[in-house]
């Protein structure tokens, strides 16, 4: 709107087309959004308009023209010149729009997961997730850096894995003639830095666990670990609460919906001892139960257990 009546140059992918004789409309999209484009044969010439008639959804073009507002109030660009930048060899899923309603959208989960690039093109809410994730990571770094934490990088290939109870991925180092493991956690190396005198450290890194996978668990995942000398668990709880509140504010998500419930992240987090909460929910003092009674309790609450599970597990 601030560019109305100004000449602008734009480039992007054609996302929709409405060809109508001597004048046509199309939507041009880049990573930041989309805008309506108006092209008229009398403005660009017969040759250039004939080239436009050959375009399809998915093609990339560059245009130069005047910004204006249509009768219905939509900001658009009237083309003075157009350049074809790249031809799309394969057709895109066509998302149709009419009177603010969307139909024939690319919504099949199976197709979306197998074609994530198409999902990003035609579903803007998916693309927004990528931008929001990057902003979350940046906000976490900003928060910890301002508290004096030092971001570090620890080895991904480790001769001895540890820091968690998980099965590792294994690989072989030919030069050293030795088996190595992809890290399952950063803990041990970060603690060495604490021992070495760096009192506040953190790492946001890829970790790998060679175990089952579902929509909530992936063998390759990103994890934040931080360690803080001279601080106890109360200090850490306070820090995590402040960090979540700070990050949620930065990404405009102070109130979120989870499983049908609204969660207000601006409010003080409830704190309750773990065993106290379990005892309240189960109606028993689990610290007084032997291993057999604990197993029966797990089965009664639909928790799968193995025959050799011990008390700690």
For each of these PLM feature ranges, what is it?
Residues 1-313:
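Class II aminoacyl-tRNA synthetase catalytic cores and aaRS-like
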């Amino acid at each position: 709107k601030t560019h109305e009546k100004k000449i602008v140059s734009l480039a992007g992918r054609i996302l929709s087309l409405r060809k109508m004789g001597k004048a046509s409309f199309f939507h041009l999209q880049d990573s930041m959004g989309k805008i309506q484009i108006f092209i008229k044969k009398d403005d660009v010439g017969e040759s250039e308009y004939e080239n436009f008639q050959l375009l399809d959804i998915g093609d990339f073009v560059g245009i130069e023209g005047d910004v204006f507002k249509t009768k219905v109030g939509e900001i658009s660009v009237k083309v003075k010149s157009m350049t074809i930048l790249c031809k799309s060899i394969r057709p895109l899923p066509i998302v149709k729009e009419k009177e603010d309603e969307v139909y024939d959208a690319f919504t099949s989960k199976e197709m979306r997961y197998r074609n994530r690039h198409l999902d990003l093109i035609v579903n803007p809410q998916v693309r927004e997730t990528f931008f929001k994730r990057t902003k979350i990571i940046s906000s976490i770094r900003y928060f910890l850096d301002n508290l004096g934490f030092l971001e570090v990088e620890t080895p991904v290939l480790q001769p001895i894995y540890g820091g968690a109870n998980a099965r590792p991925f294994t690989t072989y180092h030919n030069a050293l003639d030795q088996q190595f493991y992809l890290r399952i956690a950063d803990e041990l190396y970060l603690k060495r830095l604490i021992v070495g005198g760096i009192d506040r450290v953190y790492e946001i890194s890829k970790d790998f666990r060679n175990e089952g996978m579902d929509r909530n668990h992936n063998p390759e995942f990103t994890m934040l670990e931080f360690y803080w000398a001279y601080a106890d668990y109360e200090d850490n709880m306070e820090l995590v609460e402040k960090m979540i509140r700070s990050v949620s504010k930065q990404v405009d998500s102070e109130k979120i919906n989870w499983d049908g419930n609204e969660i207000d992240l601006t409010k003080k987090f409830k704190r309750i001892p773990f065993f106290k909460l379990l005892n309240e929910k189960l109606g028993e003092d689990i610290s007084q139960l032997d291993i057999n009674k604990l197993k029966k309790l797990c089965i009664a609450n639909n928790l799968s257990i193995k025959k050799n599970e011990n008390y700690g597990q």
